[in-house]
């Protein structure tokens, strides 16, 4: 199982008063963020296969590199679609609440809308300057699975998510595809490629169709500035460009130190830290 992890070597967990872990078990990837006295210390990501095993793999990637043991972690909160299967968590919190808390922690108190585009779901969240949820809307059935659909499309054209995003961003023309449903759009894209339509036009058209599908969800709840976009698909520059054009608003710039797919895990760690401090 492939994993991606990083440790802040400037911090020493042995000197921390409170060690908190946030675990986000998504449909595509499982993520863990560790805080030391509220400061980011470590993160890891692994592919979600069997949720309870992926959760263990994600946290063990950090434990193995740092010498931390599970019993050293004072508080552990799980979130995401597979949160109930994290056997070592002490509490679960919804991914809606965690996304809002994590976004405000990273981008600051001006954030009012969080758009979370993950592998299996798309969520739009209104929040306060403290990172509390005011309102939210989950994807309708035709916006579901956009992240995974985009991965399938990338496999189809033998590129990764970031590569197809760059191609879409730089394309001068796009093929108009159905934006009603990600499955229909993917089928149309496949047919177009088989019919020798230039790949860059199909790629650009597919990004445009997915962005329109997402923007329909945003319109149902409404958009309040400032906007941040998180989740795995936030790393795709083509989707971001199309969304900003359709919504007629620029998102807050991404933070280079933070993978947008880690924000909900960070939020879970924030809840874990706050929960321990209240004890």
Please tell me what each predicted stretch does.
Residues 101, 147-152, 256-279:
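Glycine-rich phosphate-binding/hydrolytic loop that grips phosphoryl groups
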Residues 2-15, 81-118, 123-130, 219, ...:
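Conserved phosphate-binding catalytic cores of ATP/NTP-utilizing and phosphoryl-transfer enzymes
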Residues 3-5, 202-224, 271, 275:
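Phosphate/ATP-binding catalytic cores across multiple sugar-kinase/actin-like superfamilies
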């Amino acid at each position: 199982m492939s994993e991606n992890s990083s440790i802040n070597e400037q911090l020493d967990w042995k000197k921390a008063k409170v060690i908190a872990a946030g675990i986000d078990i998504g449909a595509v990837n499982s993520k863990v963020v560790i805080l030391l006295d509220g400061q980011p210390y470590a993160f890891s990501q692994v592919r979600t296969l069997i949720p309870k095993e992926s959760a263990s793999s994600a946290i063990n990637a950090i434990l193995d590199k740092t010498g931390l043991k599970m019993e050293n972690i004072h508080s552990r909160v799980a979130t995401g679609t597979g949160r109930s299967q994290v056997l070592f968590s002490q509490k679960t919190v919804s991914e809606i609440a965690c996304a809002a808390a994590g976004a405000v922690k990273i981008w600051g108190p001006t954030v009012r809308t969080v758009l979370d585009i993950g592998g299996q779901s798309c969520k739009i969240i209104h929040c306060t300057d403290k990172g509390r949820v005011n309102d939210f809307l989950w994807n309708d059935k035709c916006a579901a699975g956009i992240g995974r659909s985009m991965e399938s499309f990338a496999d189809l054209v033998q590129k990764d998510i970031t590569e197809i995003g760059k191609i879409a961003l730089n394309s001068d023309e796009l093929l108009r595809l159905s934006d009603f449903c990600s499955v229909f759009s993917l089928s149309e894209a496949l047919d177009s490629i088989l019919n020798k339509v230039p790949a860059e036009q199909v790629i650009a058209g597919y990004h445009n169709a997915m962005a329109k599908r997402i923007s329909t969800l945003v319109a149902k709840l409404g958009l309040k500035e400032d906007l941040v976009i998180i989740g795995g698909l936030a790393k795709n520059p083509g989707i971001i460009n199309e969304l900003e054009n359709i919504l007629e608003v620029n998102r807050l710039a991404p933070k280079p130190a933070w993978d947008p797919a880690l924000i909900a895990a960070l939020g879970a760690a924030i809840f874990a830290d706050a929960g321990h401090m209240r004890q």
